[in-house]
Amino acid sequence: ARKVCGDALEMRGGIGYIEEFATPRLLRDAHLGSIWEGTGNIVAIDALTRAVGRHGADSALAADLHARLNESANVPVAWRNRLRELTDRAVGFAREVAGRIDNEGDARRATSLLYHVASAVALTWEGGRIHEMRGDARRLLLARMVIDHRVLPGDPFQLAETATQRKIT
């Protein structure tokens, strides 16, 4: 939120920072979240220890993601199986991190992986439904890009965009 509000101020050339528009209020509100909630790492630790460690929300999340993949019969089986595997790995990693206080250093990575895998599953589920209605499979491609760019390890010596990805975009 802070980045978006800051970019909005820059787009207006700084105009709006002093109460001409709603932007300064939005910027202040965006900063309040991190002030009240704490840094991303603290929020990640809290989310894992409470949601996963105490309340078992990881099981509900995994069940929902698997159900969405099961509902996506028109999505290629290989892609659904890959997402099932990544879902299980992300949930397992979150459980491992939540299981011991010594693992707090990995909390941000665990919550980010859960987020990215859940996003890819949601995009796949939506993409399958949209493809059935309109023949548009772009969300399936976006799901693939989320996994490629946010979950799978990248080679720092490789171009950021492959030939396949250039065709997609």
Labelled PLM ranges:
Residues 1-169:
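Flavin-dependent oxidoreductase catalytic core characteristic
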